[in-house]
């Protein structure tokens, strides 16, 4: 007996699904290159917490374990004074920048920064136990310092990077919740902002919500949120704007092993152990943790102070800086030295040392230098390209002074002749639509390069490296006092006089 197949039949969609295409399909690259570099970028602050006076922050928090997110502002190439105007037709084309090379310079010596907590929740040493501690006292917190996980990181894109961390979730309405129950966890994806803390070895999580005792981790993160770049989410971005390419190097080992004081919320199942007697009748705390360490820092394993060239991005955006904006995210914990500053409390210190006569301070400094090579590109404004760009990012067309005609309205609108007349109802003026900042409310380190572009590549270190790598011949468009001899059409070859050697 014949039976139809039990397999499901998948019907294709009635309309074709729009396909994301690479920028190389509609962006034409020219042979014009520019070098741009920032000034020396410096930051100084307290490595553990900001210092506040009233409602004002007088010393910011500056740590070697923070994300540095640079928002690079580029000039509008459509308003640029180009050396060759024949490459661009303003009626049918628009110009964009493509980032093809960069170098992140890092100053300051290599060093290991430490952090700690004067009241860390450490109960017992479970690595080399001399005794079996069972009943912790009311407060067993101790002063512990440690070095963190070692991280070097560089993310480049034309949109802010995304980070992930674990936060406090929402419990279902039908579940009974009591004080002291473990809260549900939720994976949160958010934009990485300048000053956010990186994963230090204790996990990417919201410590303010998930550790209410403020004693389980060091001071600089006990009320902060440590984020880890969401590489999976950024790699899945259909347009590839958030991550052109990334560099990372991470290393860590566990230095010491401790356990926590406090009531264990989830007891060990009875089938996992045999009950003890006397001093082992009560099981000690099984909430174990380790202190991380990033180990040796060396100049042989540095990701910075060297050039990187972008030939093919990992996504569909091959380095095009939409909105004339570029984001460079940097983490470098190999230069996390915390400097101790000492100041005397008296104008004439005593001859013998007295500790109370001196005040001690902690400071951390950061030093950066950003260099870029940009390539000028053009886009032909066809109907298909404009429709695709509008679907991808409508603000791009708005910045190019393009707009879409609204669909026809079926209703009849009223327009009065005398708008200011008191005989008619009040006509409220229509306010001008202000341009909305897509990154309003987010904190970035803004670097303005609108006046830092130069076509003289051979005058800059990164430009000379680019010329050496690519063999591109630069042409000086405004070099005074340089003349070229006129070419001749003579067919007579130039002969050299042979010198007779003895």
UniProtKB/Swiss-Prot annotation:
Quaternary structure, from the entry: Self-assembles into homopentamers. The capsid has an icosahedral symmetry and consists of 72 capsomers, with each capsomer being a pentamer of L1. Interacts with the minor capsid protein L2; this interaction is necessary for viral genome encapsidation. Interacts with protein E2; this interaction enhances E2-dependent replication and transcription activation.
Keywords tagged on the record: Capsid protein, Disulfide bond, Host nucleus, Host-virus interaction, Late protein, T=7 icosahedral capsid protein, Viral attachment to host cell, Viral penetration into host cytoplasm, Virion, Virus endocytosis by host, Virus entry into host cell
A Gene Ontology biological process term: endocytosis involved in viral entry into host cell
Function as written in the Swiss-Prot or TrEMBL entry: Forms an icosahedral capsid with a T=7 symmetry and a 50 nm diameter. The capsid is composed of 72 pentamers linked to each other by disulfide bonds and associated with L2 proteins. Binds to heparan sulfate proteoglycans on cell surface of basal layer keratinocytes to provide initial virion attachment. This binding mediates a conformational change in the virus capsid that facilitates efficient infection. The virion enters the host cell via endocytosis. During virus trafficking, L1 protein dissociates from the viral DNA and the genomic DNA is released to the host nucleus.
HAMAP family referenced in this protein's UniProt entry, alphabetically: PPV_L1
Pfam families assigned to the protein according to its UniProt record, in alphabetical order: Late_protein_L1
Protein name: Major capsid protein L1
Low complexity bias spans: 478-494
Family (UniProt): Belongs to the papillomaviridae L1 protein family.
Top-level taxon of the source organism: Viruses
GO CC term (a single one): host cell nucleus
GO molecular function, one term: structural molecule activity
């Amino acid at each position: 007996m014949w039976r139809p197949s039990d397999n499901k039949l998948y019907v294709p969609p009635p309309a074709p699904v729009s396909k994301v295409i690479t920028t190389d399909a509609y962006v034409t690259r020219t042979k014009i290159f520019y070098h741009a570099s920032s000034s020396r970028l410096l930051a100084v602050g307290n490595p553990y917490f900001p210092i506040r006076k009233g409602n004002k922050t007088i010393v910011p928090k500056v740590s070697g374990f923070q994300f540095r997110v640079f928002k690079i502002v580029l000039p509008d190439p459509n308003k640029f004074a180009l050396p060759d105007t024949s490459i661009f037709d303003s009626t049918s084309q628009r110009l964009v920048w493509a980032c093809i090379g960069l170098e992140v310079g890092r100053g300051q010596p290599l060093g290991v920064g430490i952090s700690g907590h004067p009241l860390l929740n450490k109960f017992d040493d479970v690595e080399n136990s001399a005794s079996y501690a069972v009943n912790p006292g009311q407060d067993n917190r101790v002063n512990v310092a440690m070095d963190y996980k070692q991280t070097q990181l560089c993310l480049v894109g034309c949109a802010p990077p995304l980070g992930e961390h674990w936060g406090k979730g929402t419990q279902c309405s039908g579940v009974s919740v009591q004080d002291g129950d473990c809260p549900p966890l939720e994976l949160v994806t958010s934009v990485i902002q300048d000053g956010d803390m990186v994963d230090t070895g204790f996990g990417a999580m919201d410590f303010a919500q998930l550790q209410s005792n403020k004693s389980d981790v060091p001071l600089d993160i006990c009320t902060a949120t440590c984020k880890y770049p969401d590489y999976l989410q950024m790699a899945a971005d259909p347009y590839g704007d958030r991550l052109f390419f990334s560099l990372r190097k991470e290393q860590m080992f566990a230095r010491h092993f401790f356990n926590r004081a406090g009531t264990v919320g989830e007891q060990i199942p009875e089938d996992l152990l045999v009950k003890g007697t006397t001093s082992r009748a009560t099981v000690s705390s099984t909430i174990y943790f380790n202190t991380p360490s990033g180990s040796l820092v060396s100049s042989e394993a540095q990701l910075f102070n060297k050039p990187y060239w972008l030939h093919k991005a990992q996504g569909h955006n091959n380095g095009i800086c939409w909105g004339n904006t570029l984001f460079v995210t940097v983490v470098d914990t190999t230069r996390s030295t915390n400097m101790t500053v000492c100041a005397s409390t008296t104008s004439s210190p005593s001859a013998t040392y007295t500790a109370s006569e001196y005040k001690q301070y902690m400071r951390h400094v950061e030093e950066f230098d950003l260099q870029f090579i940009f390539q000028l590109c053009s886009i032909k404004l066809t109907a298909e390209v404009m429709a695709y760009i509008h679907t991808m990012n409508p603000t791009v067309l708005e910045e190019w002074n393009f707009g879409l005609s609204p669909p026809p309205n079926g209703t009849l609108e009223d327009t009065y002749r005398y708008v200011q007349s008191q005989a008619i109802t009040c006509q409220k003026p229509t306010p001008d639509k202000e341009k909305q900042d897509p990154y309003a409310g987010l904190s970035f380190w803004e670097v303005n390069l609108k006046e830092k572009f130069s076509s003289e590549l051979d005058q800059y270190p990164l430009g000379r490296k680019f010329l050496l790598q690519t063999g591109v011949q630069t042409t000086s468009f405004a070099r005074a006092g340089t003349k070229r001899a006129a070419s001749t059409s003579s067919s007579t070859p130039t002969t050299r006089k042979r010198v007779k050697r003895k």
